[in-house]
Design a protein with these regions (language model features):
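Short beta-strand->loop
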Residues: 79-86, 98-102, 124-127, 205-223, ...
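Periplasmic-binding protein-like
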Residues: 89-93, 106, 165-169, 175-176, ...
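Short alpha-helix C-terminal cap/hinge motif
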Residues: 24-39
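A ligand-binding cleft/hinge motif common to bilobed small-molecule-binding domains
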Residues: 68-72, 187, 191-212, 261
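Mature extracytoplasmic/periplasmic domains
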Residues: 232-289
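A bilobed periplasmic-binding-protein/Venus flytrap-type ligand-binding module shared by bacterial periplasmic
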Residues: 109-116, 154, 225-238, 256-259
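Extracytoplasmic ligand-binding site segments that recognize negatively charged/polar headgroups
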Residues: 6-8, 12-23, 48, 57-191
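Extracellular/periplasmic bilobal clamshell ligand-binding domains
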Residues: 274-311
Length: 311
């Protein structure tokens, strides 16, 4: 007698999430212990792929979208309400979105090697670092962290954002397509600072016992970065997909996030974080655009950045 075929849950996620050092492998094995299913991660860029596939996407779940691109993602019309209790979330701001469910969060920040320079405490201090101190950033057209920086600068400087980029340009060693390449240049010693997140130093402390990498905390406030999950409307595995969305808020999932995705878990309080995270300095305030504001201003903000850096 043939064995019944177990269902497959297809989850789209970024490369870093599914890599051997990311949370993907452990999440896969833990969920499969209880779901009687085969969880298959499909790694790669998310939004361009979803735009291309539209209603024909093979995904049941999408993991790794962020708040600066949710307007575009929402307008695709391919997601259904998650139907989970948002009050279970422990975030620095209220969350009432019915489509997108955060699974982790952090703040955009510049991380510096303190053996090379003292981290600046403001955007203006960043400009005034010694001439030999260089930073690496990511391209906002291909990187969600790069986009967060563009919007962060735009929120702080408004109509003067282009002028700020002109002043910062000499400090930028290079612009990379993605976060991994930029962070690699930083850890290889090519630059003293890199655009990353306030939680990034936790990796160096916990894994390398290196306390020389520190996030610069700016007095102007920092741009929050939420990573999101969404359930695909056309999924043939609606029950499994709903189970996975529940799983995201469970301690089993949330416990994995800090030490594999190096971010704060979305459904746990500070008391539940590993001590290396609860001890990290955090910004006193968050500055950000709403979903609609970010969608409306992104093109202009990128153009100001591009024009300034091409001069």
């Amino acid at each position: 007698m043939a064995l019944a075929q177990i269902p497959t849950l297809t989850v789209y996620a970024p490369d870093y999430f599914t890599s051997e050092w990311g949370p993907g492998p452990s999440i896969e094995s833990k969920f499969e212990e209880t779901c009687n299913c085969d969880l298959v991660f499909s790694a790669g860029e998310l939004l361009p792929r979803l735009v291309l596939e539209g209603q024909n996407t093979r995904a049941d779940i999408v993991l790794g979208l962020n708040t600066d691109i949710t307007k575009k993602a929402r307008d695709l019309g391919i997601f259904s309400p998650h139907k989970k209790d948002n009050s279970r979330l422990k975030l620095p701001s209220d969350w009432d979105d019915e489509i997108f469910l955060p699974f982790d969060w952090s703040y955009a920040s510049f991380v510096f090697d303190t053996t090379k320079t003292k981290p600046p405490s403001s955007f203006e201090e960043l400009l005034n670092l010694p001439k030999n101190i260089k930073i690496v950033i990511q391209d906002p057209r291909s990187s969600i962290s790069g986009l967060a920086l563009i919007l962060w600068v735009k929120k702080i400087y408004g109509d003067n954002a282009g002028e700020y980029w002109q002043k910062l340009a000499p400090k930028i060693l290079t612009v990379t397509k993605g976060w991994s390449e930029a962070y690699g240049l930083f850890t290889d010693g090519e630059a003293a600072g890199v655009l990353s997140f306030t939680t990034s130093p936790a990796y160096h402390i916990a894994v390398e016992e290196d306390i020389t990498k520190k996030a610069a905390i700016f007095k102007e406030g920092h741009y929050p970065f939420f990573e999101l999950a969404a359930k695909v409307r056309s999924s043939k595995n609606e029950e499994l997909a709903s189970m996975f969305m529940d799983f995201i808020l469970s301690d089993e999932f949330q416990d994995l996030i800090p030490m594999t995705n190096w971010s704060y878990p979305s459904a746990q309080t500070k008391d539940e974080w590993p001590s290396v995270f609860s001890d990290l300095p955090r910004p006193k305030s968050a500055v950000y655009f709403s979903e609609n504001e970010a969608s409306e201003i992104t093109k202009q903000a990128i153009e100001e950045w591009r024009n300034a850096l091409s001069q």
